[in-house]
């Protein structure tokens, strides 16, 4: 049995996900994150699991195997990083129409929003002490 595989990196906030995507001829969808099943790693959180699986659901792909290695950030950022990496890796295997679907739905775009740094003289990034005119 020959496996087609590809290795891709996805980033979100301070999370970095490196995935290896296998597309075997048969077999169900299996996602392992840092050696654990995705449902267990994401602490039984259905929202984050749905985020990770959304590229496969959009393209109606049932035969896949994903090995993801993530570090940094929280569960939500890690899930988004995995989603981006999966989408990028799928874009290599699929036709142009399906790639366009991914692009239109924002799956191939990196969300560059990250935490703003704290400035000196302020309490937080933008929270200033109360201003008194007199």
UniProtKB/Swiss-Prot annotation:
The keyword Ribonucleoprotein applies. Its main location: plastid. GO terms for cellular component: chloroplast; small ribosomal subunit. GO terms for biological process: translation. GO terms for molecular function: RNA binding; structural constituent of ribosome. It is found in: Plastid, Chloroplast. SUPFAM superfamilies: Ribosomal protein S5 domain 2-like. InterPro entries: Ribosomal_Su5_D2-typ_SF, Ribosomal_uS9, Ribosomal_uS9_bac/plastid, Ribosomal_uS9_CS, Ribsml_uS5_D2-typ_fold_subgr. Keywords: Chloroplast, Plastid, Ribonucleoprotein, Ribosomal protein. Pfam families: Ribosomal_S9 (PF00380). NCBIfam families: PRK00132.1. Belongs to the universal ribosomal protein uS9 family. This is Small ribosomal subunit protein uS9c. The gene is rps9.
């Amino acid at each position: 049995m020959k496996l087609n595989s590809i290795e891709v990196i996805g980033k979100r906030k301070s999370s970095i996900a490196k995935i290896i995507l296998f597309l075997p001829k048969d077999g169900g969808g299996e996602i392992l994150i840092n050696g654990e099943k995705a449902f267990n790693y994401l602490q039984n959180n259905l929202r984050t699991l749905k985020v990770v699986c959304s590229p496969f659901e959009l393209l109606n792909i049932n035969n896949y195997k994903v090995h993801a290695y993530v570090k940094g950030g929280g569960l939500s950022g890690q899930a988004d990083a995995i989603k981006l990496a999966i989408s990028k890796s799928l874009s290599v295997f699929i036709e142009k129409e399906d790639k366009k679907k991914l692009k239109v739905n924002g799956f191939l775009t990196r969300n560059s929003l990250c935490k703003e740094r704290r400035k000196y003289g302020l309490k937080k990034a933008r929270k200033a002490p109360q201003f008194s005119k007199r």
